[in-house]
Amino acid sequence: MNDKDNLIFNELVVVKRSGQRVNFNSMKIAIAIKKAFDNTGLEDCEKKVNKVYEDVLSYIRNNYWDRKTINVEDIQDIIQAKLKDDNYENVYKAFSDYRIRRAASRKAFDIKSQHKFVKAIERIVFESKKNITSKPNEVLLDFGKTVSCEYTKAYVLDNKFIRAHEDGSVYIHNLDYFNLGSLSSTHLGFNSVITDEFPLNIFCTAMNAKNEIDGEITISKIDYLLVPFLLRRFREKFKEKLNKYLDLEGYLDYINFKKIEELIDKEDVINIDLDIFNQYILNKKVRNIFEIAYADSVKKIEELLTVSLERLLVSLNNIITENKKYAISLGTNNTKIGLMINNCYLDVVGKLDSMKNVTTIFKIKKNGDNCLFDRVSELVIKGKNIVFANLDASYNKDKDNEVEYFSNGKRIFENILCDEKNSIGRMIVASVSINMSRLGNRNSDKTKSEFYLELDEMLELTKNILIMIFETIGNKSKENYQVIFNNNILDDDKLESGQKIRKVIKKGVLNIELASLSECAMCLEKDKEKQKKLVKEIIDYVNGQAKKYSIENKLNFVVSETSKERPLKKLIAFDKAIYGIKKDVTDKNCYLRIDSMFNFKENIKNDFKYIGEYQKSFSGGNLVNVYLPKNITVKKFNELLELMIECNVGFMRFSMRK
């Protein structure tokens, strides 16, 4: 739209059925037309939506330029007329029928929120009839989600927040669930559940926690987590084997076995120095018995560990729920028992065919264990679901704790409430994505200061949405949850009966996500190198604002990049309806992540350096996926891991080209 058009529309006032007067908003027209096309089941109709949208605006421009008001019914009449003029008969009929049903619904339900409920339920029924493969439990789940979502829209969130979500300016994640108290991705503690029933107890905790967490659950540092359990089982097995073998050879009556048991119980490592038993070793044959008993015990523990890990991974991967994502991190415990856990785990991953629902997060450090590097590299080349977290990245280093990522690159580490950095027992409380491409489109012919002014408005809106979600969840009490606040969340032991969970979840993070950041840069800059630098500038700016919000509100605001396909598809669909097909911006089915700006081929070191700079500013992390050639060797892949460390890249996924 040119300046003259903007002037006409800026001065036009829409009169609603209730008599309320609001400013003319062309985006609502685009969304109404898009919904009409969507309800007919037509696919790839963005160009058609945009054409009808432009025709409607043209009609209003030509016929209302000298008027001050337009009725909402008149706008709908114009949409209906243009659908007919453009020969979209099915859409015209669907839109006409929709208006008739809405009129009947408004008569039946006086309250606006009730009317919206009916609209939402009708939409589910329509979708279930259209999709003949819908199962009864899936339709029932959709009904439940819709009721929860519409209740949240009607009674919980502010109208301006809902408008921003529904016009594609932002995307509120977990909108279906957060009012019920559901938390997002969480690094559960698990410290209190590693008993002799492993892996059943971990599996049950992880599975039951899914009823309270809408997101990924990570089992962090499993190569440390299992150590106490394995040491306990090793000591039991070593005493059992030693007793049995000494008895078989007739030595048991001549040795104070109780003292030997006491020595074994004092050991906190698996690589026991048998010389501590010298006073009880009567001869070479007895020493040989000790050596055999020790070796057999270690072997039994390895077998137990392998079987248990396989059961755990298979069980987690095969959970039949709507949200079934898990991650397991490991890789840095270089003790004998730690290496045993790492090697057994990698053996199991190598043996299992498909692990789509369980991601392995392998942690790497400079001068790490080369044997493990080679093993994990072989698995990645075979297509296993493994991602890498670099603990030596400048922003991940800490002398006391290891950083933990989720499989989508999201990160929790810093904590505004204390000096200690940590991840385990913390969660993403809520996430809201800002449609950066929309901002870029609107400011493509404006100054950079105007762009940042509008970005500030969106950041303020996003901050307020996140705070409202935090307060809604924080008002739940400990009794609303059965699993996650039972020694699985940081400081949940301080929660008393009946107490609100606010003081515990405030140690989690409120996630400001930037969606379509690369497309935003393309709208604002034509030169590709300048686009890459602009992306860094924008991330730095938003991160600075997030730090300010954290200090002002004593809450942990972080900045990350949107990686989920669903919001990226929804946002681009809105923008296609409004702006049409724009080269390199809306000429695809889904907005892209910023790693799409790099090919990771000709100048891969320079590309990695850019990624390292981006991730240093993304306090909440981002996902980078590098595609590998089919013929890559273990040596070449290890060089990529070393380059990742050298270039300060904190998190990366490597995928084989198909």
Question: What do the predicted segments below correspond to?
Answer:
Residues 2-120:
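Charged, amphipathic alpha-helical regulatory modules used
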Residues 23, 46-50, 69, 295, ...:
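Alpha-solenoid helical-repeat scaffolds
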Residues 27-34, 50-57, 61, 76, ...:
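Predominant activation on well-ordered alpha-helical scaffold segments within soluble catalytic domains
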Residues 56-63, 326-330, 519-524, 622-628:
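Short, hydrophobic beta-strand segments
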Residues 101-506, 532, 536-658:
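Conserved catalytic cores of very large enzyme subunits
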Residues 426, 504-521:
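Conserved phosphate/anionic-ligand binding catalytic regions in large, soluble enzymes, centered on
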Residues 524-530:
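Glycine-rich phosphate/pyrophosphate-binding loops
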